[in-house]
């Protein structure tokens, strides 16, 4: 298998750090190398809502993640690799969303083997060098390299990407400033970038202040510059060709009571965010021919002016039980910046749960979501969350963003499929029940600098399950239910 130069260089740097383990061991007294072993079983039925044969996932997988970390003075370095093998294309990594375009305009043209996810692959998740000498504060670090960008709500950043990122985290002030661009997936199966990531640059920053004990308020901004080439009208397209580009700016306000901290024992917790989107976007249509070829249509330019909000309240009934409600709304012209996962500790437990359903896995794009939940946590040994979601379209004649639902229709007599459009004028997307239960075994001993790199600080067994019932925005012929259940077992050495 031939690797592209960027992937080969990244893996070379990462494996060089792995081989340097004995040297790195002398640089710090903390545990600085190890391996995370993750076994996953997934059962998923009717992702396509019964619109074609197949669409089910039933498999088990093994995910090995060796890592190495070292520090000397103000300098540090880190790398994490990954080897995955499975009986089906299951979701061993929650960062990898099973999203499809809900607009009905995204067509699978079947010509992009470079983007086909395989059952087994090797990857390099992170490799970065850090410097912490700009200020005397221990929570300050500049990282350069492929790294995990993540914010508390997961709605702006939660991904591994090549970046230069400066973080400042103290008792009263948190700040971030950085730039990022994806150059490679660093995976043996995905040898080309997704079209949305090609030639797309990101600039971002945020600052929040603890204005009174336990209460934070802040601002954040993100700018995306995409100058990728769009094909001219009449040119043939494949799945690796971009169909949109443009320049977009997100500006947001946020306030919370440290609600994403599962150790927070405040009787009443809240969070709230309000974001504005502004910019321009060029898009080309896609037309198909009888011989299964696809061609670029007319290019259209439009202004993007949208907004989104996410609000939540959580009441602590006693040291173990909490109940709460959350509401999210994104206008028809709003989209997220593409670096999000929408996973966070919003139910008040250690488990990072998808804000828009473990089965539906929606995005903030012309979607309104109301959620009710109850959560339980016993010491640091167990936690559980039971969640109800109701999903609606804000504009009944406009598509939605990506989701874990992939209802399709066959294109005539060809062997290709495209997304099934939603019913015009109908807003009810459906409802869902989620259950997430976790048993923790032991606390991990990891360097503080790696808090963003690991989703879980300890060994565990976790069930993530969701049952989705589609609403009348989907066609009458679709199945009544779709479910997704994932069991993860994680251990560290």
Swiss-Prot record:
* UniProt feature, compositional bias: Polar residues: 93-111
One GO-annotated biological process of the protein: alginic acid biosynthetic process
Write out the annotated subcellular location: Cell outer membrane
Top-level lineage group: Bacteria
Q: What is its main location?
A: membrane
| Membrane topology label | Peripheral membrane protein
- Positions of region (Disordered): 93-115
Q: Which family does it belong to?
A: Belongs to the AlgE family.
Can you name this protein? Answer: Alginate production protein AlgE
From what organism does this protein derive?
A: Pseudomonas syringae pv. tomato (strain ATCC BAA-871 / DC3000)
Its taxonomic path starts at: Bacteria, Pseudomonadati, Pseudomonadota, Gammaproteobacteria, Pseudomonadales
